[in-house]
Amino acid sequence: MKRLLPSLRAKKRYLAFELISEVPVSRSDLVKEVMFSASSLLGDVTASECDIKVLGFEESKGIIQCAHTKVKETRASMATLTRINGKRATVHILGTSGTIKRATEKFLQNTAFEPEIRINPKRLKNNNLSRVQES
């Protein structure tokens, strides 16, 4: 059987997430609760159209695959997840990407804190430090 051309394949998005829970959670328990929350919020038809799959999960971080047209619905269903095996838990979506590699590099491999605002040291030295020294 021939393979589908890339233009005919279903497009996917990858959601990097962090699971915050009281106790450690296994991958199978997480998958079960993700599918349950999606089907209870969206209904069986829309949940199947979302094509949600938990691709990777280690410790408290992982990647979920979904259809590119159903990212908002997938994020909403993940937000409704509040308990896993009767213990309190929540899912924090770190970001969305078009490839697994980019999702991993950008959202899951945080090695150092970088502020969002870049500060020019010369500007800081001239304005703010002189005011502090005068006080």
From Swiss-Prot:
Q: Which gene encodes it?
A: rnp2
Recorded hits in InterPro entries, A to Z, give: Pop5/Rpp14/Rnp2-like, Rnp2-like_sf, Rnp2_archaea
Q: Does the keyword Cell inner membrane apply?
A: no
Q: What is this protein called?
A: Ribonuclease P protein component 2
Q: Name one GO cellular component term.
A: cytoplasm
Task: Name the job this protein performs.
Answer: Part of ribonuclease P, a protein complex that generates mature tRNA molecules by cleaving their 5'-ends.
Species source reads: Methanosarcina barkeri (strain Fusaro / DSM 804)
Q: Where in the cell is it found?
A: Cytoplasm
Q: EC number(s) for this protein?
A: 3.1.26.5
Q: Which GO terms describe its biological process?
A: tRNA 5'-leader removal
Q: Where are the transmembrane segments?
A: none
How does this chain assemble? Consists of a catalytic RNA component and at least 4-5 protein subunits.
User: Keywords of this protein's UniProt record, alphabetized?
Assistant: Cytoplasm, Endonuclease, Hydrolase, Nuclease, tRNA processing
- Give the protein family: Belongs to the eukaryotic/archaeal RNase P protein component 2 family.
